[in-house]
Amino acid sequence: MPTLGITDFWTYVLGVVFVILLPGPNSLFVLATSAQRGVATGYRAACGVFLGDAVLMLLSALGVASLLKAEPMLFIGLKYLGAAYLFYLGVGMLRGAWRKLRNPEATAAQAEQVDVHQPFRKALLLSLSNPKAILFFISFFIQFVDPGYAYPGLSFLVLAVILELVSALYLSFLIFTGVRLAAWFRRRQRLAAGATSGVGALFVGFGVKLATATLS
């Protein structure tokens, strides 16, 4: 029996868990931020991800997915902007890793001076930078909404809240994992720089993937 217009509820929850667990730029950014700057800053980044995902899900519900399909040039423009931002973040991490190798003490001092709101803004932009996420949300959610239910908006809202709750649990795990990794990496500066380089390279790869994404 559908509940609040939701069909196959537990199938949806299981699907959300698998989707959230897939490695992506949002989760990697939160992990890297918490490893570099601690729990509080990690949660600021996580809040940026939550807000960004909420905006994308709202846009999906408002029909922006149909607009993107109807206007391919809009989709192309947005995806290239998103890819450029992923490149920017990736190159920044690669440069930071190089600086850390050359002068670990100076890098640590610079990290202390970073604007505390910067991780939130970066994570928010990162979450909003993928127009294909709008298409994903609408195509994923619609499978679990009963077409005969009188209030489909309520069904969509419940599905969105469940996704955000699962995301919050997973990102919390990553934040505390990142803090533990930071303590370990502090004694191994070369390894820390290598890990940062790896994450930066992944972000560049995510940028390439987004730049070559299609509507289909």
From Swiss-Prot:
One of its GO terms (cellular component) is plasma membrane. The chain crosses the membrane at residues 12-32, 48-68, 74-94, 134-154, 156-176, 191-211. It is a multi-pass membrane protein. It is found in: Cell membrane. GO terms for biological process: L-leucine transport. InterPro entries: Homoserine/Threonine_efflux, LeuE-type. The keyword Transmembrane helix applies. Keywords: Cell membrane, Membrane, Transmembrane, Transmembrane helix. GO terms for molecular function: L-leucine transmembrane transporter activity. PANTHER family: ARGININE EXPORTER PROTEIN ARGO, LEUCINE EFFLUX PROTEIN. NCBIfam families: 2A76 (TIGR00949), PRK10958.1 (NF008201). This is Uncharacterized membrane protein PA4757. The lineage of its organism: Bacteria, Pseudomonadati, Pseudomonadota, Gammaproteobacteria, Pseudomonadales.
